[in-house]
Amino acid sequence: MNTLYLGSGSPRRMEILTQLGYRVVKLPAGIDETVKAGETPAPYVQRMAEEKNQAALTLFCETNGAMPDFPLITADTCVFSDGIILGKPRSQAEAIEFLNRLSGKQHTVLTAVCIHYRGKTSSRVQTNRVVFKPLSSEEISAYVQSGEPMEKAGAYAVQGIGGIFIQSIEGSFSGIMGLPVYETVSMLQDLGYRPPLSALKP
């Protein structure tokens, strides 16, 4: 079974990679996720994914005294609406604010993936568009009380209860979850790491 290092504590990213047939070893490393002044969404998520990768790589080398034998994957997701980058809500009040902002409108979900393997590093940004139905204050309150919006970019989970708010998606469902499958496997192949199923060849 193919092995990957995942520089993330996200259970959703772990689930996606495991479902693809990889054996996943968690290697999360924390970084400062503050948005820089004037930073736009795509450069921001790409910088986050790359900085997470470097932090996880440094942690691995310090712990093991060598570079990892298998690919190290990191990713970052953000939601962009009305010119504002929405990360993970820091409180229930902020989650309510985010959901009110998304209600009845289209927003953009960007996920950046960064992979290091055998001395080479590759990163890519994948973009999706999501349309929310208009949300009532009662729906928002009940959803926030469920706890699901916390620790989720934009304060919702497309694969969870939050999916009932979504009218349409343009892009990748897995990308909105936090790790776009097509792009991730393509990047691994480009770096010389084959997917679990040998039938998946270019």
From Swiss-Prot:
BP GO annotations: nucleotide metabolic process
An annotated Gene Ontology molecular function: dTTP diphosphatase activity
Places the protein is found: Cytoplasm
Gene3D superfamilies: 3.90.950.10
Keyword terms, alphabetized: Cytoplasm, Hydrolase, Nucleotide metabolism
EC number: 3.6.1.9
Cited SUPFAM superfamilies: ITPase-like (SSF52972)
Membership in a protein family: Belongs to the Maf family. YhdE subfamily.
Chain's role: Nucleoside triphosphate pyrophosphatase that hydrolyzes dTTP and UTP. May have a dual role in cell division arrest and in preventing the incorporation of modified nucleotides into cellular nucleic acids.
Protein's name according to its UniProt entry: dTTP/UTP pyrophosphatase
